[in-house]
Structure formats: structure tokens, C-alpha cells
Amino acid sequence: MVPTGQVAEKQAYEEPRQDHELKSWRCLVFYLCFFGFMAQLRPGESFITPFLLERKFTKEQVTNEIIPMLPYSHLAVLVPVFLLTDYLRYKPVLVLQCLSFVCVWLLLLLGTSVVHMQLMEVFYSVTMAARIAYSSYIFSLVHPSRYQRMASYSRAAVLLGVFISSVLGQALVTVGHISTYTLNCVSLGFILFSLVLSLFLKRPKRSLFFNRSTLARGALPCELDQMHPGPDRPETRKLDRMLGTCRDSFLVRMLSELVENARQPQLRLWCLWWVFNSSGYYLITYYVHVLWRSTDSSLSYNGAVDAASTLLSAITSFSAGFLSIRWTLWSKLVIAGVIAIQASLVFCMFQIRDIWVCYVTFVLFRGAYQFLVPIATFQIASSLSKELCALVFGINTFLATALKTCITLVVSDKRGLGLQVRDQFRIYFIYFLMLSITCFAWAGLDGLRYCQRGRHQPLAQAQELRSPLETSVQAISLQDGDLRGPQPSAPQLLSEDGMEDDRGDLRVEAKA
């Protein structure tokens, strides 16, 4: 039994230490959120299309030569940047992202040829691939019990930065009557400031895959053999250790877990939604500003529309967290309904030649997509570990990028069909329409099977009737570190489609 004096002395030692850790954590959170906010302040981003057209680039060059370079280069750099992000422990990739933004705006301001603008797209693809570094970085520095709060803080900072940036850009153009060139110079100033901030970020000591702690890795069978060697011969023990290392390596275990979890219908469904819907979504955002320009070149409320769509996206994604339905039964029908709404909005965009209709339909289109993003995130993560969740999101992002690259090559690139922007939107309308019909048919078949049984389907998971928000709150109490344990509160390593990427949405809209 510990003497009372020693207990009091230990408590007196622990209390200042805990206060110091709490103060340090708060300072770190504030600095990270401030960096996330400042990194989004690029008010000229919503007006890049008018700027390019003022620089005497034609609509055909922007549509069929400049923009297609973005998905091509994004596909090329996505996997290397993803691996470097974890291997270098996040901070160097955040600095690289800021440097790439500097190169983007220098080329935008100083470039004079299509090749310069294509090179600008290459640098911007690096910034798109590096977005995962911020969302991964903030979770590597805090205890798992603070994941939920960190997700909300960082997400709020990013959304606020996107909203303020769009409002500021629109105000400077409409009220201040400044030129788009000056607006891009202001953006470059903000980017340089965010670059300075990135240099003072704290570098984590661990990461998710390559720099895992000893406790997270655990003792492998070969390590146990070394501690308790058997009577076998040295050569046999060495061979067994090598085979055990390969068999029980972290990557092999993750892949085996992925194959096992791929049998879950809900996981397959939402991964398919992520790949196919996000591809169409980003194709729309790539080219929507060109569509606006071709509809009415006298009005330019790009910043206001971006701000409104960001606000609506935040509202719809937040409200989705409180939606409580039986997802095993209704997922396909909800997805089909939302995609049908998206298809009708895309139809209105290219068919009704009114700029205000184009503005409103795009705001609604973006809000509809962001409504399903948090639902998909929690449905995918509901039975996956933190590491496996990151791997699945990475695979989904890669497949979505590959799909939109193929569509771009066929539809947009001058080496393919080279369609004008309005004809492209017809293709995208057919794309969403076919997705909707497929999901409705899929839901109908499930409904027929359900009716034939004449009884309720058993719930696949205990949290089926809960909302994603309730699911994530429950997951906070789960143990962090077991590869097989469900951890839906895992870091939101959303590469391109979650709310962490909202700034990227505005950029590709502006570039389009």
C-alpha cells in the first residue's frame, strides 16, 4: 500500500504536468486551425476562368487543352504523394503543398502560353494530392479521445476559410472594382503567408503506416521466437522468422482484412457510390465556370455562388449526421434519389440558358453531393480500423480519379471527342441518369426480395438505426489500436471528396 505522503506528492507532480499538456494541446489546436484557415484564403480562385479569358486564351483552349491536364497529372501524383505524406510525417508535404500553390499563382500571373497553363495544372494537382496531409497530420498529434473534437475544429476552420475567401473575392470584384490580375496578386500574398506558417508546424514523431510506434505494431511472432527460442535448428528458426515476418507484416494483415471486409454489402455499396458519384461531381466542378461564361459573359458572381454553395454544403452535411433510418434497407433508395436530383440539376444547367438558373442549380447540386459524403464516410468506417479506413478511402480516391481521367480523355480532350462545354454537360447528365436508374433498379430488386420474405431483414450491425453522428460518438469509447476493432471515429482521411476538400472544389470550378 502506497503511503499517503507519496500519493499526495505524486498528485502534486501530476497536476502541473496535466495542466501543461492541456495548455500545449490547446495552443497546437489553435495554430493548426489557424493554418488551415489561412491556407484557404485564395480570393482569386473563383475568378480564374475570367482571368484566363482576359489573357486571350480561347474557351476551346481552356476546355480542351488546359483543364484536361488536371486529372491526368492528379492521377500520376496521387499515389506517390500519398505514400510520401506518411513516410515524411506530414509536415514536409504541407510545405510542399504551399510551395506548389506559389508555383501555381506565379505561372498564372506570369505565364503566357498554353504550356505554361498546363504546367500550372500539374502543380495544382500536387496540391490536390497533398490535401490528405492536413487531415492526417492533425490526428497524429492528439490522443484518440480528442479525434472527434479535432475533426470538428479543423473542418470548421477549413469551411470558414473557404467561405471568407469566396466572399472576399466577390466583394473586391463587385464593390472594390479591382481587376482579376490584382485579385490574383492578393491571393499570392495570402499563399506566401500560409507558406511561412507551414514552416513552424510541429512535426509528428509517428505516422499511420511507415512510422508506427512499437506499441501499435505489437510483438510479431518472430519477435516472440527471439525471446523464447525453441529447440529447432538455427537455419529453420531463421527461415520461420522470415516467413512469419512476411505473413504477419502490417501491410499483409491490412490487405487480408480488406478482402474480408469487402464481403459486406454496405461497404461495397458506399465505395461504389464514392467512386462513381465523386467522379461525376468533380467533372461538373471542373467545367461549370466555363459553362457560366458561355451562358452570360457580362455577369461574374462566381465568388458569391462559391460562398453560397459552401454554406449549403456545410448545412446539408451537418444535417446528414442526424438522419436516423435503417441504412441496410434504404441506402440504395436514398442514393438513387439523390443522384436523380443531381441528374435533373445538371439537365437544367445546360438546357436552361439563364445564368441565375445555372447559379442556383450548381449550389443545389453541390449541396446534394455533400449531403451524402458524411453518410458514406461513416458507413464505410463503421466496421473498419483506422488504418484500414485510410486505405479504403485512398483506394476509392484513386479509382475515382482514374475514372474521371478516362472520361476526360474521351469527352473533353482534343485528342478524344473534344466536345464543347454544353455538349459535355449533356454527357454528364446521361452519366448521372444511368447511375440513378441503376440504383433504382438495384433498390427495386432488394425490395422484391424483402417482400418475398415477408419479414424484416436482420440488422447487419447494432448501429443500423442510429445516425452517423451517434455512431461516431459511440466509437470514441472504443479502443484505438486493434486492427480488427471497429473505429468509425478514425481520422477523416478524405482525399478529395469530403468537406476537407471544399476549397479544392472551388478551385476546379474556377479553373473550369
Swiss-Prot record:
Alphabetized UniProt keyword annotations: Acetylation, Antiport, Cell membrane, Folate-binding, Membrane, Phosphoprotein, Transmembrane, Transmembrane helix, Transport
Signal peptide: none
UniProt xrefs under PANTHER family: FOLATE TRANSPORTER, REDUCED FOLATE TRANSPORTER
Main localization category: membrane
Listed transmembrane segments: 30-50, 63-85, 90-110, 115-137, 152-176, 182-200, 267-292, 301-323, 330-350, 354-377, 392-415, 424-448
Region (Disordered): 478-512
GO molecular-function term, one example from the UniProt record: folic acid binding
A GO cellular-component term linked to this record: brush border membrane
Phosphoserine: residues carrying this PTM: 467, 472, 477
Modified residues (N-acetylmethionine): 1
SUPFAM superfamilies assigned: MFS general substrate transporter
Positions in the Extracellular compartment: 51-62, 111-114, 177-181, 293-300, 351-353, 416-423
Cytoplasmic side: 1-29, 86-89, 138-151, 201-266, 324-329, 378-391, 449-512
Family: Belongs to the reduced folate carrier (RFC) transporter (TC 2.A.48) family.
Its biological purpose: Antiporter that mediates the import of reduced folates, driven by the export of organic anions. Also acts as an importer of immunoreactive cyclic dinucleotides, but with a lower transporter activity. Mechanistically, acts as a secondary active transporter, which exports intracellular organic anions down their concentration gradients to facilitate the uptake of its substrates. Has high affinity for N5-methyltetrahydrofolate, the predominant circulating form of folate. Also mediates the import of antifolate drug methotrexate.
Membrane topology: Multi-pass membrane protein
UniProt-recorded name of the protein: Reduced folate transporter
Protein's organism: Mus musculus
A Pfam family per the record: Folate_carrier
Claim: Transmembrane is one of the keywords in the record: yes
